Curated annotation (Swiss-Prot):
This is Trafficking protein particle complex III-specific subunit 85. It comes from Saccharomyces cerevisiae (strain ATCC 204508 / S288c). Pfam families: TRAPPC-Trs85. Residues 82-125, 678-698 are annotated as: Disordered. One of its GO terms (biological process) is sporulation resulting in formation of a cellular spore. The gene is TRS85. Present with 8760 molecules/cell in log phase SD medium. It is found in: Preautophagosomal structure. Part of the multisubunit TRAPP (transport protein particle) III complex composed of BET3, BET5, TRS20, TRS23, TRS31, TRS33 and TRS85.
């Protein structure tokens, strides 16, 4: 089986890949997935009932969410495990009437599949070649459950997930499982949840705002044009009919697409779909996609059944739900490939062209006129933006909603420019994103919450778009000052919030801002670690991780994850001049054990260059932080993590005898570990490993 991005992020599914390696820029893949375009899925109760009866899934959304992630990877197909069955199914589908049927209409065309690259996104040289998507609930549901405090993520929920996830890791592994890559996968799962959400509608950025609304009809259940029209009208009128509809949302900026689902065994249903699609395009001006969601072979062909895994990116609430009630969902390989073909068309032929059209329109109508008028003269821009009358510029620009909150309206030039920058990030056009963020920053001086997020993503766009080596000068003069300014602005927001909320709990008041600040620092640290010159960039990552430990309100398990990441940072801090010598030195040390006395550590066989090499690493400091992490894991009763931490530092501390003395922390931890039966949890069989008990991991 080819090791993929999904395998790494869900490595507990794929422990047979635990000795693989991942590219250093893996963080860029995760961030691209975390800010991927969001698609809402709307279906009728009748449709959802049909789905539930056929595939044991609650709704169409719950079915399609399995297919979020990298579109080109098609990871749910799990081709290597089914072997020849995939080719048999694909050949059979080529002979059916579904292909010529769909050629008569602009719907997913299976023949397009060969024209698009399906290379593994994990190892692509240019990460921008991959397109990620995320699915979420209907927009009305998101608004009804929206948290009014604008919090990016919940610290407590993140801690609950991590605690249960680590217990699951302990139950499904033993001391013999290679753990180095698995521990990195665990950290990046934690990292992805701290920077991503599919249900948080932030007023300050648009990454989680839906871009496309997929409106589904069940032709097999007799749903017709009138049903489609009513669903579209309800969607378009959400801003009028929904209580507390956010003023920063606009359904007219979302692309509606009809998904017409039918039984592929019925020629009559297919013809109805064709006629309905033409009518919807002619009268409602909305595109349609046909999907053969039902077919006897999809249900009764047990030879090509695939068990689906949870998506890599999902909301924290959904992950916790599947943690408490893990489920197994299976689909036939033919249906899985049909859904991926539909998504290919949806993403590449409808969504991305729509986004590019909107970006071009905003550039021509908002961005270019501003550049032409001021031509980069920041002094004049600041002068024009100032309101000379009593400094009321902020109140004139912001709009108050029904709950008394003040935000930029969806039609304001500031918010549209922010959307232009965010959509450029989603399309991997980092140059346009950076220039737009930079242009917008001067307009947001009076709005610190908006300004902080804008500065943060200006820095992220620089790091994400860095295809060549980022120089020390660029980090020192451009990138790090942006991050420091963003953090200072977030801190200013916290002070303002504390001043407004003197009568309430100050922690409750500042937590929403702190969640953004935490996200900023954890993003910066991972992107610095993804740079090629780790000797230069690692100190910046260390600085932000230490600040997270000092200032952010993380739970104990979350804090220990950061302690371990600090250890990883020091492991990476190797002078580039002697990187090749470190590995050679270690091998030489192993080959010369006979030169060492039984109680004496002799260094006579090392050359001067070896000693120099040993001095230009931070291995001992890395081991020290790992030892701290082991102590803290022991306090949380996470004995598998304690065992792995002690294994990691064994080679570093084996020659330092005094550290093993009675009463010292190392010997205490070993004694505690010996008293615990870390392998007491039942071991799953190789075939059933993680599939039954880890199906919720995202």
């Amino acid at each position: 089986m080819v090791f993929s991005y999904e395998h790494y992020m869900n490595l507990l599914f794929h422990l047979d890949n635990s000795k693989e390696t991942v590219p250093p820029e893996i963080a860029k893949r995760i961030i691209s997935n975390a800010i991927a375009p969001v698609i809402t899925v709307t279906s009728t109760p009748l449709f959802d009932k049909h789905i539930q009866e056929t595939y044991k899934v609650d709704s169409l959304y719950m079915l399609l969410r399995f297919f979020g992630g990298c579109v080109s990877d098609r990871d749910q197909a799990n081709e290597a495990k089914v072997g020849q069955h995939e080719h048999e199914v694909c050949d059979a589908s080529d002979s059916t009437d579904s292909i010529p049927k769909n050629k008569n209409l602009e719907v997913p065309n299976l023949s397009k599949k060969g024209s698009r690259s399906r290379s593994n996104s994990l190892f692509q040289r240019d990460s921008t070649q991959s397109q990620y998507i995320r699915f979420t609930r209907p927009l009305g549901d998101l608004i009804e459950t929206r948290d009014a405090n604008d919090m990016l993520f919940n610290y407590h929920s993140l801690e609950v997930f991590l605690d249960n996830y680590l217990k699951l890791v302990a139950a499904n592994t033993d001391e013999m499982v290679p753990h180095n890559l698995l521990k990195k996968s665990i950290y990046h799962s934690f990292f992805s949840l701290a920077i991503s959400s599919t249900n948080n509608l932030s007023p300050y950025e648009t990454f989680n705002h839906p871009i496309l609304s997929l409106i589904a009809l069940d032709i097999s259940n007799g749903e017709v044009y009138e049903d489609a029209r009513d669903l579209l009208v309800n969607f378009k009128n959400l801003n009028h009919n929904t209580e507390n509809f956010p003023i920063f949302m606009n359904t007219n900026e979302m692309l509606p697409v009809f998904l017409l689902c039918y039984n592929d065994d019925s020629q009559e249903e297919f013809e109805k779909c064709q006629a309905l699609a033409k009518k919807l395009k002619k009268q409602l001006f909305v595109e349609s996609i046909l999907l053969a969601l039902w077919k006897d072979s999809f249900i009764y062909d047990e030879n090509s059944v695939i068990q689906l895994h949870q998506p890599v990116m999902s909301s924290l609430e959904e992950i916790l739900f599947f943690l408490q009630a893990p489920t197994q969902t299976t689909l036939s390989l033919a249906l899985i490939n049909s859904i991926y073909d539909m998504l290919d068309y949806l993403v590449y032929d409808l969504m991305i062209p729509f986004m590019k059209r909107k970006v071009s329109f905003w550039e021509e109508t908002i961005l270019q006129p501003r550049k032409s008028l001021f031509n980069g003269a920041k002094f004049f821009k600041k002068f024009m933006n100032k309101n000379p009358v009593n400094g009321n510029h902020q109140h004139n620009s912001l709009t108050r909603d029904s709950q008394g909150n003040e935000y930029f309206a969806s039609s304001s030039s500031e918010f549209l420019m922010r959307k232009l920058a965010d959509w450029s990030m989603m399309l991997s056009d980092f140059k346009t994103a950076y220039s737009t963020y930079e242009s917008l920053m001067d307009d947001l001086d009076a709005f610190p919450k908006y300004l902080a997020s804008c500065i943060e993503w200006c820095a992220v766009s620089l790091l994400m778009g860095a295809q060549s080596i980022v120089t020390v000068k660029m980090i020192k003069n451009d990138i790090n000052p942006l991050i420091e300014r963003a953090l200072a602005t977030y801190e200013n927001c916290s002070r303002i919030q504390r001043g407004k909320g003197k009568e309430s709990n100050s922690l409750d008041v500042t937590e929403p801002v702190r969640s953004y600040e935490t996200r900023c620092m954890i993003l910066a640290s991972e992107l610095f670690l993804s740079l090629s010159n780790t000797w230069t960039s690692t100190p910046y990552a260390i600085q932000y991780l230490e600040t997270i430990l000092d200032e952010c309100k993380l739970g104990p398990c979350s804090q220990i994850m950061v302690w371990e990441r600090l250890s990883d940072c020091y492991n990476l801090r190797v002078d580039p001049r002697i990187k090749h010598r470190v590995g050679a030195m270690k091998k030489d040390a192993k080959d010369t054990e006979d030169l060492r006395g039984e109680h004496k550590y002799s260094t006579d066989h090392f050359t001067d260059e070896d000693i120099l090499s040993e001095g230009l690493t931070r291995r001992r400091k890395a081991a020290f932080f790992r030892l701290i992490a082991a102590k803290k894991w022991a306090e949380q009763k996470q004995w598998r993590q304690v065992s792995w931490c002690l294994k990691d530092i064994e080679s570093t501390y084996s020659e330092i005898k005094f550290l093993h003395g009675n009463g010292l922390i190392l010997s205490k931890l070993k004694n505690q570990l010996n008293l615990k039966d870390v392998d007491s949890a039942p071991r799953p069989s190789e075939k059933n490993l993680t599939r039954t008990s880890v199906s919720f991991i995202g």
